[in-house]
Amino acid sequence: MIVLIDADSLIWSSCYKQKETPEDSGYHNIEDAKDKYNEVVMKIINTIEVDYEVDKVITFAGARGNFRKQISKTYKANRIDREVPPILNELQDYVKEQYQSKQGYGIETDDLVATYWTNLTDTFGRDEVIIVSIDKDYKQLPCIIYDYHYKKQCYHNITEAEAKYNFYEQMIMGDTADNVNFCKGYGKAYCKNAFKDCLSDYNYIRVVFSLFKKIYKQ
């Protein structure tokens, strides 16, 4: 099994600790952050090794630039004022040095992971690659995902049909975390009903196109 780790969220969360006093910043020092990151990664790999024989681990983190922001100025604009952990860049550098993490330019980390997943599954087969991430966007791929979130710690085995549905559902629902919502008021219930007879990409595209045409009257 080839394990692809999207480490962005893990690096971010490794910067934080529980506040011990009201004056506490809530951030780890760099050495504690490294230890936390290493500990969680080892736990993830050990968990996967219970079910699969791990042949290779590839880490992805710290993408620079994003073509989506050139298309839409509102993309992730809701995160502009978010405080960035002061040791974030240093921890990213550590992961790059210690784990030889792959870094995307002009794209996001999940774009790079998806590209690697596609190429590797073409070569070794879909059941020989697993993505490690808490990001729901990967459910748009017919892949095996390990969600390491402490409340979940579970596998998702996404079928072709599920991946297709998830892809077109997100075209309508958008993603509030990324400040993407072009069809306000249309959620899961709408998609479930609108897509109930859809099988092909053409079926889905007709539904999505009709809705956008209705909303934007173009």
Predicted regions and their residues:
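Domain-level signal for Mg2+-assisted phosphodiester chemistry and nucleotide/NA-binding surfaces
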Residues: 1-93
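Extended two-metal-dependent nuclease catalytic cores across DNA- and RNA-processing enzymes
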Residues: 27-28, 52-54, 78-218
